[in-house]
Amino acid sequence: EGAEFTWKFYAGHYTADNLPSEPTKTWVTKTIAEKDSDGTIHYVSRLSDEYKVSGDSFYTQDGKNVLPLGTLTVEETKAPNGYLLDGAYMQANGSEEQIKGMYLTQITEDGDIAVLSGSNQYHVSDKVIRGGVKIQKRDLETSDTKGQGSATLKDAEFEIISLNDNAVLVEGKLYSKNEVVKTILTDIEGVASTSADLLPYGKYRIEESKAPEGYLTDGAEPIEFEITEDGKIVDLTGTDTSIYNQVKRGDLEGVKIGAGTHQRLAGVPFRITSKTTGESHIIVTDDNGQFSTSSDWASHKHNTNAGKTSEDGIWFGTSEPDDSKGALIYDTYIIEELRCEGNKGFELIPPFEIVVSRNNVTVDLGTLTDEYEKEISIHTTATGKDGEKSIVAGK
């Protein structure tokens, strides 16, 4: 609907090669939706007042619109919304011939009858406007296009949903309103894109259906967009149109004791290091040998990453500390006990790795036990003149 046709009548018989520069009369008509007996809707345009947009008065006879002998041309001069004039063509009923641009016909006399050369009913086909879309995935905390820790923005899954009342044709299949017409995945840069001719003219919504590794769907708000220009990709990669995800965060906790008496070791520092980024912070045990990165234990915001006492907060990443989240980003970490006065005389446990992979889950390291350092003993042996052996031991 909304297409317009320009009709030109010339008083005389002409061909396309010798048409006068000025027609005798000109009319512009529009298309109007009409329903067939079977319910099929067609968009029709005729030389009558109901369809007329502008132009001269019609020729009439006995109260009816008629065309006198002469030459008539018709050409689509305005495509309907969502369609292109370029590539449009007309076809007579039952004919395979495609007429592009101006169509010319003559009204001639056959005895007492006026005859219209060719058909008096044609179908016009227009090419629909098609475009595409490009979306950017970003980290919710940093607004960056790079994932935090070992999390990645690659392989996020997006669904493109039609919001059009009429069915749309995508890759040879018709889709109704609210149906998913295409699923796309992000690349290593967090960008997902369609081709420039995938989506027909209309309105769509893009929403995340699967978060990338290490991320939650939290923060991923759907975005609506429209295809209005042919061959154009709608760019949604800006900071205000990107889709954001919250990285998974967790915590760790444990207890430090000495072997034998199970003495709780206070003031023992542990270095926590990201295997992916190398970011490293120190956590310290309290008077009971306990330690935790949770904000319930010590606020992330209190002396953040000072690493001096058990009350200093821990926070990984470049965003502002947030006590509603875990301190550790989705990643693998190396835990290393550091030498201090509190573990003097004990053998330090060897460094070990832990994985933070579940959101808001605290990894319990259990009880970490330092064994006493082994004492070094020196033994000497001497033989007397009589050949008998005697042993003297000392420390």
Language-model features: locations:
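Solvent-exposed loop/turn and edge beta-strand elements of beta-rich ligand-binding domains
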Residues: 1-395
